[in-house]
Amino acid sequence: MTRFVTGGAGFIGANYLFYLRGHYPDDRLVCIDKLTYAGNLSTLAPLLGQPNFRFARVDICDREAVYGLFEDERPDVVVNFAAESHVDRSIADPSLFLQTNIIGTSVLMDACRKYGNVRFHQVSTDEVYGDLPLDRPDLLFTEQTPLHTSSPYSSSKAAADLLAGAYGRTYGLPVTISRCSNNYGPYQFPEKLIPLMIVNALADRPLPVYGRGLNVRDWLYVGDHCRAIDLVVNHGRIGEVYNIGGHNEMRNIDIVRLICRKLGKPESLITYVADRQGHDLRYAIDPAKIHAELGWLPETRFADGIGRTIDWYLANRPWWEEIVSGEYQTYYARMYGDRPMA
């Protein structure tokens, strides 16, 4: 089988490629990635040079290049991780998010139609549902929750989801969609909360927390997410949406304090900064459907997963030190350097 993984040099995509190689050693894997700031070719070093692995530096919006890859490789399945995914960046400049997340997805699905009605899986986010109140812990996102986006990022992902559903209904494309809660684990770019706090704490730098840090997120270890996607791709019902959640709800401030404790760093490093515009209060996913239909449940408790993640960043300093030494510093200064205190 030939599998296309778009966005495979990014955090979740790379972990998914490693998962596939471990479980399907004879399959041909083709990684398609534009190598934006969040894509890192060094992450894929264990796969590069393998005879049944190909890396293609291609923008999914480049129709000619995408069609050329389909012509060469004739994939059996496409799993689309390729996306601009950081909410703050989408607020600063929505245009790239609309282009990559919507137009890029349509180009991929057009290629799937053109080259044999290829199986297509769209990786999405719980952010398409909006947010939940902090005082109603009984409320969870289900697959029936209406789409109610809060940011240009989540709006672009919701549009891509709707487009995928439309391609399934209009053209008969075999499509599935998964929507996950917040991921964490190895190889995550340090603009996201957990790796940002780990990297800053290790350097004794301020730990910027939006508002008072009371926003709640449901945390999903990336390995559990990869296993869930594999089940949906292989056994999910065509045309269906599957929510993937970690059953690990935590306030942002509690995560930051936990990281400080595990690294032996003082909480005085925590710096409260002005809140994000339209900051969602709480995300929490009900994974009952994927459990009932496919037998999936998260296996990684947050206490174990965060320890594993911290250990990885401690053991792989060269990977993240290279990232934080370049263009990222300019972005970091723009996002946090001039932000007023909360």
Describe these PLM feature segments.
Residues 3-4, 58, 195, 201-342:
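C-terminal substrate-binding subdomain of Rossmann-fold SDR/epimerase-dehydratase oxidoreductases
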Residues 159, 163, 167, 197, ...:
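Hydrophobic alpha-helix immediately C-terminal to the catalytic Tyr-X-X-X-Lys motif of short-chain
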Residues 41-44, 132-135, 188-191, 255-256, ...:
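Short aromatic-enriched loop/helix-cap "lid" or pocket-rim segments at secondary-structure transitions
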Residues 185, 189, 218-221:
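Active-site helix-initiating loop/hinge in glycosyltransferases
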Residues 1-183, 308, 313-316, 322, ...:
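N-terminal Rossmann-like NAD(P)+-binding domain of SDR-like oxidoreductases, especially those catalyzing
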Residues 35, 182-185, 215-216, 276-277:
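Short histidine/acidic/glycine/proline-rich micro-motifs that form metal-
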